[in-house]
Amino acid sequence: DQASMQRASRLLHQCDLRPRDCARRSSERGQGERWRQQLRACDEDSEPRQQCCQNLQRISSQDRCRA
């Protein structure tokens, strides 16, 4: 939904990632679902912020979508 997308993109900025590039590339490479699950975990604060960023960056670097 809209609100969680906004939270997600704020989170990604804090992690130095560009949400759109990431989402697009990761879905092209079949990683989209993993990426979304990770974002959701971050959004629900089930993981510490730092851990979140690292996980997202790991997925991102595999998809080469670093900001």
Curated annotation (Swiss-Prot):
Q: What is this protein called?
A: 2S seed storage albumin protein
Q: Which GO terms describe its molecular function?
A: nutrient reservoir activity
The entry assigns this protein to a family as follows: Belongs to the 2S seed storage albumins family.
* Quaternary organization: Heterodimer of a small and a large chain linked by disulfide bonds.
Recorded GO cellular component terms are: aleurone grain; vacuole
Keywords assigned by UniProt, alphabetized:
Cleavage on pair of basic residues, Disulfide bond, Seed storage protein, Storage protein, Vacuole
Q: Which compartments is it annotated to reside in?
A: Vacuole, Aleurone grain
Task performed by this protein:
This is a 2S seed storage protein.
Main location per UniProt? other
